[in-house]
């Protein structure tokens, strides 16, 4: 049986909205999204060394292509590191979509 997870949903959303180039940083937290993108081979992922750089790359792409720039980040500090480029894009009027992902975890003292 094939699983359809949040990464698949995000990948499908990006493709269906003609967002076929995305920028980001590979991390353990966003692997489900990147796996789904790679599995379909319909969206180009452009890796960056840091989230801020990825955000600026997505901003530049959006400005030069008249498309929405997409940046995929890690969680926590990784997501925070993209904020500077989001602010720049906001004040420039550039459409930029930040995407971050984490797994749902339950506290260890809960029984389900």
Residue map of PLM features:
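Hydrophobic or amphipathic alpha-helical targeting/insertion segments
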Residues: 89-100
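Conserved small/polar residues in nucleotide/adenosyl-binding loops
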Residues: 102-108
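Aromatic/hydrophobic pocket-lining residues that form π-stacking "cages" and hydrophobic walls in ligand
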Residues: 58, 85, 102
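Active-site-proximal alpha-helical scaffold in enzymes
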Residues: 74, 83-87
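Thiamine diphosphate
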Residues: 1-74, 78
């Amino acid at each position: 049986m094939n699983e359809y997870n949040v990464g698949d949903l995000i990948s499908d959303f990006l493709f269906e909205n003609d967002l076929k180039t995305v920028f980001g940083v590979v991390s353990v937290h966003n692997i489900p999204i990147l796996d789904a993108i790679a599995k379909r081979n319909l969206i180009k992922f452009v890796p960056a060394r840091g989230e801020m750089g990825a955000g600026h790359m997505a901003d530049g792409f959006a400005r030069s292509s008249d498309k929405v720039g997409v940046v995929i980040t890690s969680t926590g500090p990784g997501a925070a590191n993209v904020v500077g480029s989001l602010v720049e894009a906001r004040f420039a009027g550039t459409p930029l979509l930040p995407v971050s992902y984490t797994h749902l975890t339950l506290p260890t003292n809960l029984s389900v």
